[in-house]
Amino acid sequence: MDLSFHAPTPLQYFASLVQSDDHFPLLEAVASLAQDEYPELDVEQVLGDVDQLLARLQRRLPADAGPLQRLRLLNQFFFVDLGFGGNVNDYYDPDNSYLQAVLRTRRGIPISLAVLWMELAQGLRLKAHGVGFPGHFMVKVQLPKGQVVIDPFTGHSLSREALSERLEPFQPRQLQGVLADDADVPLGLYLQTAAPRDIVARMLRNLKEIHRSQQDWGRLIAVQDRLIVLLPEAWAEYRDRGLAYATQGHTAQALTDLETYLHHAAFEALDIGTIAEQVDALRRKGG
């Protein structure tokens, strides 16, 4: 009987973390994303580093601090004392999505900074959540007198007017340039809480776009593997992985993914014909 222990691969470990939405371990799942690039990464050490930051923060907290005081204390600690902020000099560096690098450099992109900030906020018993705002991830906190929306890239709170202005490029063209009050911009629709699974997916898609723009197909495929584990019915991800496999010359894997996409994709998908032609070409090549 073979009793030897085989450590899970990074993808198997990730799959175990994201298999259920009940008690989804957001911080651990996000920390594990770096294991494709840094296979020796100790995820538990990353979690421990965040716990140490929280312990330092909690020692500063007066016993009778209300929610607003806790929020101010958190922002002072995170953005001023520790100096976390956006990486404006190298925004598209993949390390901006890897928590161990963000903790070391104190620089990241909005969504990675938000994950760390939310972990600390929840440790202070603040009702904090992520917001999948178009083009720029936000965080929100529910206070007794209302909701505060914060840009984790800068630490600044945002007014309704500022949010409406940021939303304008994503509005239908006929509403662009119309005052927010006149157009009745549905801000509430864009300020809904982002589920942990959606946060991880957005981070992976950020990495996906970086690797695709650099034509780094090996790293792109590794990201696609995680996206398909995370979102097994996101058929477009099979298509994109299949196209990456085809670029790498992995015909069998490309055919499997592209045929899966064709089988499940809606008939009105605009690229059905193009993908079908590519499948035919790959079959001829493989045959």
Identify what each model region corresponds to.
Residues 1-287:
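A structural boundary/capping signal
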